Design a protein with these regions (language model features):
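Acidic donor-binding/catalytic loop of UDP-sugar-dependent glycosyltransferases
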Residues: 106-114
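Acidic/histidine-enriched, beta-strand-rich ligand/metal-binding domains
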Residues: 14, 64-67, 94, 110-111
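N-proximal low-complexity "stem/linker" segments adjacent to membrane-targeting elements
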Residues: 1-32
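Short beta-strand-to-loop acidic/aromatic patch adjacent to the donor-nucleotide binding site
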Residues: 96-107
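A short, glycine-/small-residue-rich helix N-cap motif at loop->alpha-helix starts
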Residues: 77-84
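Active-site nucleotide-sugar/metal-binding loop of Leloir-type enzymes
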Residues: 86-98
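Acidic donor-binding segment of Leloir-type glycosyltransferases
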Residues: 29-73
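Structural beta-sheet core signal
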Residues: 12-14, 40, 101
Length: 114
């Protein structure tokens, strides 16, 4: 596959869970911006009913077609919204000093990344 060059030099953290319809809208915008570094954080399943959505979300974020450094933290257990917000940002900011933070229902315009 011929990879496109990154366009944005600010890392992006995407927090997601089991909502592929919402995540696909967010990820489409991120793909247009093509950040050079991407952090992917997913909370774990609460029960087996969450698994199809979790798998569908992982499939969406696996479709990276540009050059970027990708780090993934996919939790085995469910921490919930507030703890996941904290854990994901603590993880990302332990590696970088600035980062755009998006949740799976934050659909940015491409100009937001500039």
């Amino acid at each position: 596959m011929n990879m496109k060059s990154a366009l944005v030099d600010v890392p992006v953290l995407i927090l997601f869970f089991n909502r592929p319809q919402q995540l696909s809208q967010v990820f489409e915008q991120v793909k247009k911006a093509r950040p050079s570094r991407l952090f992917l954080y997913q909370d774990g399943a609460r029960n087996e009913r969450d698994l199809p959505g979790i798998k569908a979300c992982r499939e969406i974020v696996s479709q990276i077609d540009w050059e970027c450094e990708v780090e993934r933290l996919y939790q085995e257990k469910n921490f919930g919204c507030d703890p996941s917000e904290y854990l994901s940002q603590k993880w990302a900011f332990s590696k970088v000093d600035k980062c755009i933070v998006l949740e799976d229902d934050d659909v940015p315009s491409v100009s937001f990344f500039q």
